[in-house]
Amino acid sequence: MISKINGKLFADMIIQGAQNLSNNADLVDSLNVYPVPDGDTGTNMNLTITSGREEVENNLSQNIGELGKTFSKGLLMGARGNSGVILSQLFRGFCKNIEGEKEISVQQFAESFQAGVETAYKAVMKPVEGTILTVAKDAAKAAMDYVDQAEDCVDLMVHVIEAASESLDNTPNLLAVLKEVGVVDSGGKGLLCVYEGFLKGLKGEKVEAQAPKLDTESFVNDDHDFHGVINTEDIVYGYCTEMMVRFGKNKKAFDEQEFRNDMSEFGDSLLVINDDEIVKVHVHTEHPGDVFNYGQKYGELIKLKVENMREQHREVIRKEQDGIQNKATNESKTVETAIVTISVGDGIAELFKSMGATHIISGGQTMNPSTEDIVKVIEQSKCKRAIILPNNKNIMMASEQAASIVEAETVVIPTKSIPQGISALFQYDQESNLEDNKSHMNDALETVQSGSITFAVRDTKIDGIEIKKDEFMGLAEDKIVISDFNQFHAVKGLLSKLLNEDSEILTMISGEDADNSITNQIIDWIESEYPDVEVEQHEGGQPIYQYFFAVE
């Protein structure tokens, strides 16, 4: 009979729960609705609870209240992805309920499950039923309904697991997309794995490891460790050049298409934003003076910036060779406003950096950074203010959680894709205050449609589309709109959904697996089918996704 749970027993439960989730992480990942090759729910929940487990193992206590604080802190800082954040919030509420206790009774055990559910629901802006939240809620309700009959904590835990399993099986009836794909909710399955491990711990049993231990080191990659791979002499256009031009009455009439065409002759990485009174330009060029002279044809130059990217690159190489440049570089940086972007791909990181991002965290579709990764970057920058660009919907909650922890005044711009992040960052003005920048950057999100091309990792049917393993899928925002074994056909199908007669600019970001011949084929097709659309092509170097597209 186990009528009480103390810190030592709770630690055993946590360790076995974490191990059971680790053993089943791949299974949980396989339940993800979209068949994209991302490490997602299982990976994120596993990394999150592993962070909590490691914190517990390093700070063991007989006092369950103290151990709960330790576990909650580890989960909070290690939370990755939306599923990881929700898991951390479930146990934040659970552990808050046992605060100050040396040990807890069966009644308190049941009440703690309920407290966790209440905390998690409050943390999610728009709770969706048929998810991990529902499984947790149904399990907690069962615990509260059964607690008076429970013989001990083991008996209660058995009942919690039965209710969670039944709730998990019912998730397809609550969420249509689960029923269409033929899976149960992945987050709910992950939570059930944790609960099953808890029961093992309560009974004094051990979950044997079936998977290699995960490396939970930070994914911070500020200033990029990849500079040494690129030769300075390989930089074709050496000056990152920006200008703002206020249109003049007696100057040349502004035609945006003509302006873009002429500007594109000066270099690459061209970005142009026009608001009828002012045009803002970002371009990498060999001749900044020519860019400024051209801008003066249209009006008054009000803001200019030129940075020598070759010299910046040499400096980074020097620091790396001296052993100065590493993941801890952030500690030496002090900025008034830290602009933190999350991205993956050398080219994308370089583009963000050239546009003013002060810190790059390596992460995205294939690996979500933790709350702690984001917190560390902001705190080590010693900034007064911070702006976070998640650039992925699954990094949003960790970003918001980080913003609530740090001392600096911090805002999260809800960018769900790399193209949205680029558009938002282009609106940043270092002379403006945080609220104005937040407003302008949020407004920029309304002007961008995002698309991407990747491949399917399994057969499925979703949104009415039959998908075969290894087909190329076109996603408009988060919705699969086409699937085809021919990559070019998939791209055409996707762009036909994104482009229309009002489209002006198409930004194409090529991934590390993009084929140059297909890239050229795409550009030729766009120029033929959509002659009024200006194409801007960048080498992003991102894995998994052959192309990102942005339509404005």
From Swiss-Prot:
Domain DhaL: 8-200
Source organism per UniProt: Staphylococcus epidermidis (strain ATCC 35984 / DSM 28319 / BCRC 17069 / CCUG 31568 / BM 3577 / RP62A)
The organism's place on the tree of life at top rank: Bacteria
Coiled coil region boundaries: none
Name of the protein this chain belongs to: Uncharacterized protein SERP0792
Gene3D superfamilies: 1.25.40.340
GO molecular function per UniProt: glycerone kinase activity
Biological process (GO), any one: glycerol metabolic process
